[in-house]
Amino acid sequence: MALYRKYRPASFAEVVGQEHVTAPLSVALDAGRINHAYLFSGPRGCGKTSSARILARSLNCAQGPTANPCGVCESCVSLAPNAPGSIDVVELDAASHGGVDDTRELRDRAFYAPVQSRYRVFIVDEAHMVTTAGFNALLKIVEEPPEHLIFIFATTEPEKVLPTIRSRTHHYPFRLLPPRTMRALLARICEQEGVVVDDAVYPLVIRAGGGSPRDTLSVLDQLLAGAADTHVTYTRALGLLGVTDVALIDDAVDALAACDAAALFGAIESVIDGGHDPRRFATDLLERFRDLIVLQSVPDAASRGVVDAPEDALDRMREQAARIGRATLTRYAEVVQAGLGEMRGATAPRLLLEVVCARLLLPSASDAESALLQRVERIETRLDMSIPAPQAVPRPSAAAAEPKHQPAREPRPVLAPTPASSEPTVAAVRSMWPTVRDKVRLRSRTTEVMLAGATVRALEDNTLVLTHESAPLARRLSEQRNADVLAEALKDALGVNWRVRCETGEPAAAASPVGGGANVATAKAVNPAPTANSTQRDEEEHMLAEAGRGDPSPRRDPEEVALELLQNELGARRIDNA
C-alpha cells in the first residue's frame, strides 16, 4: 500500500500542519455549531479530501458530533481510512460528474433521509469543475437544505466556485507544509517503516514534493521501494529524482565568486557529461542563489527553517555568501531567471545555459542598474583587499617641515573672505570636496565609492545639491542613510548643518574647485616627493573613477559579448546562417 494511503489521518488530531483549520473545526464540533455547507480549498495533496472524510466521521459518530470520534461505532468503522465507506456519505468527483444532469441527480438523492447515520453528507471533490448550470441546479438546495443534509466542497481553485454557492459556506483554506514540519513527518514515517535515510536526502525529497504531504510521501515511497538493505543513500536519491549534484552547484558558485571563466564552463561540461538536464541545473543554481541571499540577509535562516540543508552544506553556503556581495547575487538570480524563460521549449538548452554563464561573468555587458551595482560592489571589494593597514610614516625634520607647511597655510584666508559668522559658499565647498570625501570614507566606504562622478552644483537654503551622471547612483545617494552620512561629513569638514540631495545631470562647468589654480601653484612650488599614501590615493581615485564613470565606452550587444567569450574560452566557431 502506498505511504500516503497507509498513513492517512483518521482524526483532526492526526492532521499535520493544518492547525489553523483543524482547531476551529474541533471547537465548532464540540460546541455543536454545525453549518450546512463547508468549502475546503488549497493546493493539491494538502489534506482537503481527508479532512472532509474526518468531518463526516466526526458528525456521524455515535458519541458525536465530536472532534474525537470513538473509532468503534458502526459509522466510525465504515468511515475509517481505507474502509469501504458509509451509505450515508457520498463522494462525487466533479471532474467527471460536473454536468447539470449529475447535479440534478445528486439534488434528487439529497432529499432522502439518512439510513443509519445522523447526517447525510455529500463530499464534492474538485468542485471548481462543476459547470455553471450544475451550480445553478444545486443553488436552491444549498440555500435551504434539509436538516439532515451537509455539503462539503473541496477545490484547488475556490475563485471558480459560483459566488452564490461560496457565500453560503464556511470557507477553510488549507496550505502547504513548511520544510521543518515536513521533515519531522518524514522522519517519523521512516522510523515506523524501519528505514534509514541519509540526512542529505530529506531536503531533496521535500523540494521534489513542493510542500504537498501527499506528493512528498509519494516521492519517499519511490525511494524506499528501490532502497537496498533498507537504506536510502544520497547517491541513489540523486539518480532517481534527477537532481543536480550539490558538488556541481558548489563548483559553479565558487567559479563565479572567483570570476574564473574556465572553472565555470568546466562545471557546465561536467553537468552535461553527467547526463543532467541543463534546465534542471539552472533551476537548482537559481535555488542556490536564493539560499545565499537569504543566508546573507538572515544569518539564522537555517535555525528558522527558511533554508533547509545539511550542516556541512550550510557551512559552505555561508562561506559563499560572505565571498559574493548581495547586489551580485541579486543580479545572478535575475540573469538565471531570465535564462530559464529562454530555455523553455528551446532545442539547444546547453548553448543557452553557456550564454547565461557568459552573462553572469560580464556585468559590463548590461546597462541595467543591477549590473552597475555589481560593478560598484566589485570595485569596493578590490579596495578592501588592496588597501593595506595604515603604517607609521617617519616624520621629516623640523627644517624640512617648515617650507612644506608654511605655503599650505597661506591660502586659507581665501576660503573665508566673509566674516566668520557666514556659512561657506558653493566655491568653498568645491574646494573642500576632497576633505569631505575623506570624512565620508571614514563613515561608509560604499557611500564614498558612489561619490565618484558626483559634483557640487548649488546651495539652496540649507540643502547642498549634488549632480551625478549616473541615475541609479544618484538615487542611491539620495537615500536617507547615504544622505545622513554626507550631512555628518559636511558637519565635520565645514561645521555646517546642511541636508544633501543628489540629482541626475551632466557635470556643471563650474564644478572645478575655486582657487584650484592657486592650490596647484602652491603644490608645484612645494614639489613634495611622492609618498606611499599619495600613490595609494591615486590608485583609489582611478578605480573610483572607473566605478562612477557616466559615459563609458560604447555599449556592446550582450549576445555578441557572450559569443566572443565562448569563442575565447571554449574555442567555439560561429556558424552564420546561410
Swiss-Prot record:
**Can you tell me which residues bind ATP?**
G42, P43, R44, G45, C46, G47, K48, T49
Its EC number(s)? 2.7.7.7
Query: Looking at the record, which segments are called Disordered?
Result: 389-423, 525-559
Q: Which GO terms describe its molecular function?
A: ATP binding; ATP hydrolysis activity; DNA binding; DNA-directed DNA polymerase activity; metal ion binding
Sequence ranges of Basic and acidic residues compositional bias: 402-412, 536-559
Main enzyme class: transferase
Enumerate the UniProt keywords alphabetically. ATP-binding, DNA replication, DNA-directed DNA polymerase, Metal-binding, Nucleotide-binding, Nucleotidyltransferase, Transferase, Zinc
Stretch forming the signal peptide:
none
InterPro entries found in the cross-reference section: AAA+_ATPase (IPR003593), DNA_pol3_clamp-load_cplx_C (IPR008921), DNA_pol_III_gamma-3 (IPR022754), DNA_pol_III_sug/sutau_N (IPR012763), DNA_Rep/Repair_Clamp_Loader (IPR050238), HLD_clamp_pol_III_gamma_tau (IPR045085), P-loop_NTPase (IPR027417)
Q: Name one GO biological process term.
A: DNA-templated DNA replication
Q: So which domain of life are we looking at?
A: Bacteria
Q: Report the protein's function.
A: DNA polymerase III is a complex, multichain enzyme responsible for most of the replicative synthesis in bacteria. This DNA polymerase also exhibits 3' to 5' exonuclease activity.
Family, according to the entry, reads as follows: Belongs to the DnaX/STICHEL family.
The record makes one more remark, namely: Was identified as a high-confidence drug target.
Q: How does this polypeptide assemble, per the annotation? A: Interacts with the beta sliding-clamp (dnaN). DNA polymerase III contains a core (composed of alpha, epsilon and theta chains) that associates with a tau subunit. This core dimerizes and associates with the clamp-loading (or gamma) complex (composed of gamma/tau, delta, delta', psi and chi subunits) and with the beta sliding clamp dimer to form the complete DNA polymerase III complex.
This chain's protein is named: DNA polymerase III subunit gamma/tau
Q: What organism does the UniProt record list as the source?
A: Mycobacterium tuberculosis (strain ATCC 25618 / H37Rv)
Taxonomic path: Bacteria, Bacillati, Actinomycetota, Actinomycetes, Mycobacteriales
- Its gene name is dnaX
